[in-house]
Amino acid sequence: MRKLCVSCVVAFGVMSGAASAASKAESCGYQAQVAGAIQQARLDRVRERKVEAHVKAAATWPENYNTAIPLMVPWVYQMKMRDVRKQDLAAAWKELCLQQ
């Protein structure tokens, strides 16, 4: 899980508009919110193909962070449900993002 998560964080480091416009902490915070929303969608048993629309409907982050949703969904949906229930994916994402 950590290996896949790190590769996703590296991919988001390339987000041109978001990374340059916002501070690193703010950007990582928004990315963590997206990860948390996807985790909650999984816990709410939203089907994987409907997650993007479901998460966008309740988005509280800037619109440009919606591009992260299709990249994060497989990361969350490939995890075992017990791991999704027990772990705080938003906090894990933010921690790894800030380390980059």
Task: List where the protein language model places each region.
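Secreted/luminal cysteine- and crosslink-motif detector
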Residues: 6-9, 29, 98
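Short N-terminal segments immediately surrounding and downstream of signal-peptide cleavage
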Residues: 22-38
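Classic N-terminal secretory signal peptides
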Residues: 1-22
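Compact alpha-helical subdomains of small soluble proteins
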Residues: 42, 46-100
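General structural signal for alpha-helix termini and helix-helix connectors
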Residues: 12-14, 37-41
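Generic hydrophobic secondary-structure packing signal
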Residues: 17, 24-27, 93
